[in-house]
Amino acid sequence: MIHFVLLVSRQGKVRLTKWYSPYAQKERSKVIRELSGVILNRGPKLCNFVEWRGYKVVYKRYASLYFCMCIDQEDNELEVLEIIHHYVEILDRYFGSVCELDLIFNFHKAYYILDELLIAGELQESSKKTVARIISAQDQLVEVAKEEASSISNIIAQATNR
């Protein structure tokens, strides 16, 4: 089971967190601080797996971001590396070569994509095409809702101007 997902920049700034196990807010801050320090200080040639508090942390660096997932000891690290890569590929497909700024300004989309991949710390959808189709449908629904809200606002504005 994946206990949490953490995206951290090279500067140590948290860009995304998703918790699948209960942690108090104080504990979350401590975990983020601790893991950021451990992962950011590791050399690029070292293994992408870290033993930590009875768990394993699997991480991978893409550009200026570290994608980290905390898993149980008995879980397969290579599978989790593939899940991380899968997530990055979907982000790349959606944003067109994703960068840190995409995640900063469109964090809600990054969370939505992650929620399509993982539920309760387990892989839900392995098909990139299916996830892309679902995200596209969601984007279309948002556009329709914006158009309807805009037309309702126009009707209200016209009614109040009379």
From Swiss-Prot:
Subcellular location: Golgi apparatus; Cytoplasmic vesicle, Clathrin-coated vesicle membrane
GO annotation, cellular component aspect: AP-1 adaptor complex
Tissue and organ expression note: Expressed in roots, stems, leaves, flowers and siliques (developing fruits and seeds).
Pfam families: Clat_adaptor_s
PROSITE patterns the record matches: CLAT_ADAPTOR_S
GO biological process, one term: intracellular protein transport
Membrane topology: Peripheral membrane protein
GO molecular-function term, one example from the UniProt record: clathrin adaptor activity
InterPro entries (UniProt xref): AP1_sigma (IPR044733), AP_complex_ssu (IPR016635), AP_mu_sigma_su (IPR022775), Clathrin_sm-chain_CS (IPR000804), Longin-like_dom_sf (IPR011012)
Major localization class: Golgi
Superkingdom to which the source organism belongs: Eukaryota
Alphabetic keyword roster: Cytoplasmic vesicle, Golgi apparatus, Membrane, Protein transport, Transport
PANTHER family in UniProt: ADAPTOR COMPLEXES SMALL SUBUNIT FAMILY
Summary of the function given for this chain in its UniProt record: Subunit of clathrin-associated adaptor protein complex 1 that plays a role in protein sorting at the trans-Golgi network and early endosomes (TGN/EE). The AP complexes mediate the recruitment of clathrin to membranes and the recognition of sorting signals within the cytosolic tails of transmembrane cargo molecules.
The family this protein is said to belong to: Belongs to the adaptor complexes small subunit family.
Record text on subunit structure and interactions: Adaptor protein complex 1 (AP-1) is a heterotetramer composed of two large adaptins (gamma-type subunit and beta-type subunit), a medium adaptin (mu-type subunit) and a small adaptin (sigma-type subunit).
Protein name (record): AP-1 complex subunit sigma-2
